[in-house]
């Protein structure tokens, strides 16, 4: 169970940082973009996203800026930092190594996986 939770957390962080690497977004926009880009295979709830963003902010991986929207409403925009970009590259490398290791074991034991990308 712990492995699954840690894996989900790492993958979610990787995907959020990857999206932010392409530009600044506010929380709800991140949720929508993740679901759209994954074609509905990944969805994240606000109760998961915001604690993750706060953790990333605390670790200097993400910064934020509050902007006034309309006359009274404030929206918080999130942006990946240089530390966040470096961390994203580390996560991507670890994820790539893990996927390669899984594929190696599956192929060695007569199974295979088929990954389709656009």
Model-found features: residue ranges?
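Glycine-centered, phosphate/nucleic-acid-interacting loop/turn motifs that mediate DNA/RNA or nucleotide
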Residues: 60
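Short, solvent-exposed loop/turn elements at beta->coil junctions and helix N-caps
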Residues: 4, 67-69
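Basic, amphipathic "hinge/linker" alpha-helix immediately C-terminal to the N-terminal HTH DNA-binding motif
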Residues: 70-92
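Short beta-strand "wing" residues that participate in macromolecule-binding interfaces
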Residues: 64
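N-terminal helix-turn-helix DNA-binding core of bacterial DNA-binding proteins
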Residues: 6-48
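Basic amphipathic alpha-helical segments that dock to polyanions
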Residues: 49-56
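Amphipathic alpha-helical dimerization/coiled-coil segments
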Residues: 86-118
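Intrinsically disordered, low-complexity serine/threonine- and proline-rich regulatory segments
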Residues: 1-10, 91
């Amino acid at each position: 169970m712990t492995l699954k939770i840690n894996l989900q957390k790492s993958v979610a962080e990787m995907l959020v940082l990857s999206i932010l690497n392409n530009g600044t977004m506010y929380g709800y926009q991140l949720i929508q973009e993740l679901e759209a880009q994954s074609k509905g295979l990944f969805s994240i709830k606000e109760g998961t996203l915001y604690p993750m963003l706060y953790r990333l902010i605390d670790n200097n991986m993400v910064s934020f800026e509050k902007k006034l929207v309309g006359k009274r409403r404030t929206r918080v925009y999130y942006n990946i930092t240089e530390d966040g970009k470096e961390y994203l590259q580390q996560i991507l490398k670890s994820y790539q190594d893990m996927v390669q290791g899984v594929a190696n074991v599956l192929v060695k034991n007569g199974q295979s996986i088929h990954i389709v990308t656009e």
